[in-house]
Design a protein with these regions (language model features):
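Pan-zinc metallopeptidase signature
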Residues: 90-152
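Acidic/His-rich structured neighborhood in mature extracellular/periplasmic domains
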Residues: 1-58
Length: 152
């Protein structure tokens, strides 16, 4: 822990999301338009923004089309033009889960340009559907942050 954020948490979480949750529960955690996760993400972004005409080499993932500006009510406003639609989903689940687990509280001002719900309470109140999905015991998602004391 400490004041420095461990970036490996984000990268490991992305791998688990991309190859684990999506593979086991595609209709729920699929990173494509129409999955439960994607519908929740589109709501958090204030709409569905993607370039439907561009299909990546895997055949179903659509290239992202970040809007020139997000709607004023959006709380997920990731603006990396290189992030495809599936990538946007991965980032959304990362931001929501790490906020629920308490990893983002001290970074609220630093991440506000991408994610406005930096605490568990903010996720519960403003995006209750993603909170309910990520805390549903059926999916056995993390319930605490790693603390580096494995096997001790």
């Amino acid at each position: 822990t400490g004041s420095r954020f461990d970036a490996s948490l984000e990268e490991i979480f992305h791998l688990i999301t991309d190859t684990g949750y999506e593979g086991v529960y595609p209709s729920v955690f699929g990173e494509f338009p129409g999955s439960e996760l994607a519908n929740l993400m589109d709501n958090a972004r204030g709409g569905h923004f993607s370039n439907e005409g561009t299909i990546t080499e895997d055949g179903y993932r659509y290239a992202s089309a970040v809007p020139s500006s997000y709607p004023s009510g959006a709380w997920y406003t990731y603006d990396d033009e290189t992030c495809t639609y599936d990538c946007m989903n991965t980032e959304y689940i990362y931001w929501a889960m790490t906020s629920i687990l308490g990893a983002q509280e001290e970074y609220c001002s630093e991440i506000r340009h991408e994610w406005k719900l930096c605490t568990k309470e903010k996720v519960m109140n403003q995006d209750p559907a993603i909170y309910n999905l990520l805390t549903n015991p059926e999916y056995k998602l993390p319930s605490s942050l790693p603390d580096g004391s494995y096997g001790r």
